[in-house]
Amino acid sequence: MHPNVYIPDAFLEKIQTILPANLNMEDFISACQRPLRKSIRVNTLKMSVEDFVKRAEDKGWTLSPVPWCDNGFWIEADESVVPLGNTAEHMSGLFYIQEASSMMPVSALFMNDESYDAVLDTAAAPGSKTTQIAALMKNEGVLVANEYAASRVKVLHANIERCGVRNAALSNFDGRVFGGWLPEQFDAVLLDAPCSGEGTVRKDEDAMKNWTQASVLEIADTQKDLIESAFHALKPGGVLVYSTCTLSTEENQQVCHHLKETFGDAVEFESLDGLFENANAALTEEGFLHIFPQVYDCEGFFVARIRKHHSVEAPQVKKRMGKFPFVKASKKESEEISKQLHNALDIELPSESTVWLRDKDVWLFPDALEPMIGELRFSRMGIKIAEAHKNGYRWQHQVATALATGAESNAIELTIEEAREWYMGRDVRPQIIPEGLKTGKGEVLVKYQGAIIGLGKWVSNRIKNGLPRELVRDKNLF
């Protein structure tokens, strides 16, 4: 229980005025004082839901489906010895610990099983929705993941890497720049807007400590700027999903109505009634989902799906771009890199991607990124696959996380003890070496329970650990 949750009286008075007639304040307060149920989302870039459910059964985890996300589950697991974040399944990117209601905006974006070539996630960190989008895109097309706070870009990249995302390009800008810098560039835009966080008290009992009505109105002004910019960045015919983890109508319905008032018949609100069974329990008259915490026993949340019917005039913006530091590899260079990767690790380069070079670094960019090169300065694009040296290429960790599947001939299965040693940054001496696997020298993929966990190098009969230092863990491991 969270009986110490701080909820200002002025906020409760406000909720009383916006709470739907079929809900009551007692249930609202009671829900706010209950801790959230823990939830996870299976990362289908790495494992099917069916296989994950079997794995969960073997581990004694109890899963209950989240109705609005096909690969989302509430989970009951004994974390007294090993927290979920330190399980092998989490560390190898098989699942993401994500609040159930925060899975809803991405489900709304892909409500009709859409296929998008270019998607913008305007406020992406820490990466739960970014990785959810990448999985639904099947790592195809390009996903621009923007984060305004520079301090949060690092964790965004870490989660993208852990989950095997290779079609992302990261940027670090105020989300208000996209409408002017990349007008009508995206098939879909997610704006999970910064907000007053009124829906998060079940996760953070101090979430409302600094709440004031004045701060709500100030944030709403920013949200209106952000949604205008997001709409400008959207192609005609495209879909914008606007979401918050707050309850105030000023930050939700009124922001959407501001967009409609600004752009008129270019804006259509598409009803989310059919998103999942019983969605109508939170449906507004416009077709938005305004979710109070007692309705589905989750965080307070808001989601709107908006269609752009035709072009609107975008602001003219001057921008100064530095020299782009990458050059596209020649056909011969690409073929040589592809051949060496295949020979070394039995990995093929994916189609719809191109090799780019910067000094000795070898990168793989999604082809769909190319129209944006020179239009926006990215902090990171695609994946770094190698560094060139005099004897060939030194393959990088993201080759293992984003390109390997676990079925490669040059991959070795570790025991649980060896896998723990691996995650602690230590070299391993595998007890079981499959017949025909070359040892002694060269690089090798390592896996645990079939899931790739890294890339190492043979030194005689041991594998030199290639795990990046920032990923090394030292205690409470599976």
From Swiss-Prot:
CDD domains per the UniProt record, alphabetical: AdoMet_MTases (cd02440)
Enzyme Commission designation: 2.1.1.178
Catalytic activity: cytidine(1407) in 16S rRNA + S-adenosyl-L-methionine = 5-methylcytidine(1407) in 16S rRNA + S-adenosyl-L-homocysteine + H(+)
GO terms under biological process: rRNA base methylation
GO molecular function annotation: RNA binding; rRNA (cytosine-C5-)-methyltransferase activity
Key words, A-Z: Cytoplasm, Methyltransferase, RNA-binding, rRNA processing, S-adenosyl-L-methionine, Transferase
Subcellular location: Cytoplasm
UniProt binding sites for S-adenosyl-L-methionine: 123-129, 147, 174, 192
GO CC entries: cytoplasm
Ranges in a coiled coil: none
Active site per database record: 245
SUPFAM superfamilies in UniProt: S-adenosyl-L-methionine-dependent methyltransferases
Keyword Cytoplasm attributed: yes
Reported function: Specifically methylates the cytosine at position 1407 (m5C1407) of 16S rRNA.
Annotated family: Belongs to the class I-like SAM-binding methyltransferase superfamily. RsmB/NOP family.
Protein name: Ribosomal RNA small subunit methyltransferase F
Organism (species): Vibrio parahaemolyticus serotype O3:K6 (strain RIMD 2210633)
This protein's encoding gene: rsmF
